[in-house]
C-alpha cells in the first residue's frame, strides 16, 4: 500500500470579472505560452460578441454550449489478448466538462475566420443551438461507444 497521502482535488477558481468557474476553465485551456492576460482578452471579447449576437446573458449561452457538448460516455483503448479494443467507459462531470471545453476550443480553432474571439463566439453560439463541430464530435464519440458496447465487460 502506498504511503503517500491522498491529494485533495483542486477546485477551479473563478475569473475576476464574471466570477464564473467555467470562464476560468476556458481561460486556462486557451492559454498558450503563459500569456494569461491574452487568454482573458480573447475570452472576454468572445463573451461580448455572444452578447451582441444573441442579446441574452452570454454566461447562460456558455453554460448551455458546454452542457450540450459534454459527453456521457467515451471510448478508451484497452489491450486484451494481443488485440486493442475500444472499450466504452462512463465519464464523470468534471472530466466531461474538461472534454467539452477541449472540443469547443478545437472546433473554434478549426473554423475559418478573423480572430480567435470571433471563432470562439461563433462556435459557442452554434453549440448552444445544437449544431457545430463540437456537437458533431460528441455525437461521433457516443456512436463509437454504442458500436463497441460489446466490449463493455472489459472495463
Swiss-Prot record:
Please provide, in alphabetical order, the Gene Ontology terms of the cellular component aspect for this entry.
chloroplast; small ribosomal subunit
Q: Which UniProt keywords apply?
A: Chloroplast, Plastid, Ribonucleoprotein, Ribosomal protein, RNA-binding, rRNA-binding
Function recorded in the entry: One of the primary rRNA binding proteins, it binds directly to 16S rRNA where it nucleates assembly of the head domain of the 30S subunit.
Indicate the family of this protein: Belongs to the universal ribosomal protein uS7 family.
For this protein, the record's NCBIfam families field holds: rpsG_bact
Its subunit composition reads: Part of the 30S ribosomal subunit.
Name assigned to this protein: Small ribosomal subunit protein uS7c
Tell me the organism: Saururus cernuus (Lizard's tail)
UniProt gene name: rps7
